[in-house]
Amino acid sequence: MIDNGGRFFAMKHGRKIHRLSRPADQRRALLRGLTTQLLKHGRIKTTRAKASAMRKYVDKMITLAKEGSLHKRRQALGFIYEKQIVHALFAEVPERYGDRNGGYTRIIRTLPRRGDNAPMAYIELV
């Protein structure tokens, strides 16, 4: 056993989470904001880590909109910051993504950011 000051840390096999160097509440707020902006504009530029972390939540919101029940709409309203985006999402998504089972976003790598050389990417709705 490894001596690490009396604390034992078990390995987290298969439980990958993108921490993004933030506490849980700030990370959730960041991902909610990025998801809202992507659904509003259709395409945003962000770091690759943030893009891959938010992809899960965007796909979840689109899946909720495809199901379209009142319960799913209220779940989406609890996550997306702007009410108008939720209404537009639930009106537009069933005919746009009706035959697609997942994979609603595309990540396009681009040049690193000039100031700190962070890897950047565009994330867009397919």
From Swiss-Prot:
Q: What UniProt keywords apply to this chain's record, in alphabetical order?
A: Chloroplast, Plastid, Ribonucleoprotein, Ribosomal protein, RNA-binding, rRNA-binding, Transit peptide
InterPro entries, from UniProt? Answer: Ribosomal_bL17 (IPR000456), Ribosomal_bL17_sf (IPR036373)
> Which Gene Ontology BP terms does the record give?
translation
Mention one GO molecular function.
structural constituent of ribosome
**Principal place where this protein is found?**
plastid
Please verify whether the record's keywords include Cell membrane.
no
Source organism's superkingdom? Eukaryota
Keyword presence, Ligase: no
Give a GO cellular-component term. Answer: chloroplast
One matching Pfam family is Ribosomal_L17
Q: Where is the transit peptide?
A: 1-10
User: Where does this one sit in the cell?
Assistant: Plastid, Chloroplast
Described by its record, this protein's role is as follows: Component of the chloroplast ribosome (chloro-ribosome), a dedicated translation machinery responsible for the synthesis of chloroplast genome-encoded proteins, including proteins of the transcription and translation machinery and components of the photosynthetic apparatus.
Alphabetized NCBIfam families for the sequence: L17 (TIGR00059)
Quaternary structure and partners: Component of the chloroplast large ribosomal subunit (LSU). Mature 70S chloroplast ribosomes of higher plants consist of a small (30S) and a large (50S) subunit. The 30S small subunit contains 1 molecule of ribosomal RNA (16S rRNA) and 24 different proteins. The 50S large subunit contains 3 rRNA molecules (23S, 5S and 4.5S rRNA) and 33 different proteins.
HAMAP family under this entry?
Ribosomal_bL17
Record's family? Belongs to the bacterial ribosomal protein bL17 family.
Q: What is this protein called?
A: Large ribosomal subunit protein bL17c
